[in-house]
């Protein structure tokens, strides 16, 4: 199970890196322009993925409190800050830096897990408390689906702008 999740989170990190590279080539105005998506701009979608990854990791952290290596992997997240609204160029650079920190923390966290950790109960605060917890492996699947979904939104917007991309799927580079 660990090998599978490592493949997915490494692919996630690679896709985020490539997307950040594409978005960095846009003007700040183009990156921040309201594109009529739920999170408005390309920057907003990118930051939503980063922020949700940090949020999911906070849930995962609470599920494995006795795994010191997993806890250590998430320590860099303490440096994170939420960047809201339209960003300046300098803030965008910070958002990209945060994305790299979050993606590395996620890979390191998965590397630190043992087989029983994947069954650890993760407390969730949605679905009206039913169920109150789900296994960590399930939440990891939800994370992967979530990030792929939003990368797909970014990809669709980039397509409409005639910017070459294909980063909503899995890369075979990791095989």
Spell out what each predicted region is:
Residues 80-124, 132-153:
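Acidic/histidine-rich alpha-helical segments that form the ligand environment
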Residues 14, 18-21, 25, 101-108, ...:
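A generic structural signal for well-ordered alpha-helical segments enriched in polar/charged residues
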Residues 1, 5-8, 91, 95:
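Residue-level preference for long, well-ordered alpha-helices that form the structural scaffold
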Residues 6-20, 28-82, 126-175:
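Short, contiguous alpha-helical
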């Amino acid at each position: 199970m660990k090998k599978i999740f490592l493949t997915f989170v490494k692919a996630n990190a690679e896709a985020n890196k490539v997307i950040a590279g594409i978005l960095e080539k846009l003007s700040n105005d183009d990156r921040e322009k309201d594109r009529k998506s739920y999170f408005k701009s390309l920057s907003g979608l990118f930051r939503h993925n980063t922020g949700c990854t940090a949020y999911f990791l906070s849930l995962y952290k609470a599920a494995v409190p006795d795994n010191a290596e997993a806890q250590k992997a998430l320590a860099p997240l303490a440096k994170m800050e939420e960047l809201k609204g339209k960003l300046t160029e300098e803030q965008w650079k910070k958002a990209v830096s945060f994305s790299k920190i979050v993606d590395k923390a996620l890979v390191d966290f998965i590397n630190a897990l043992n087989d029983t950790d994947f069954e650890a109960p993760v407390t969730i605060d949605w679905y009206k408390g039913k169920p109150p917890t789900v296994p960590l492996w399930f939440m990891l699947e939800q994370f992967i689906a979530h990030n792929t979904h939003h990368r797909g939104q970014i990809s669709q917007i980039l397509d409409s702008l005639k910017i070459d991309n294909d980063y909503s799927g899995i890369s075979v580079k990791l095989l």
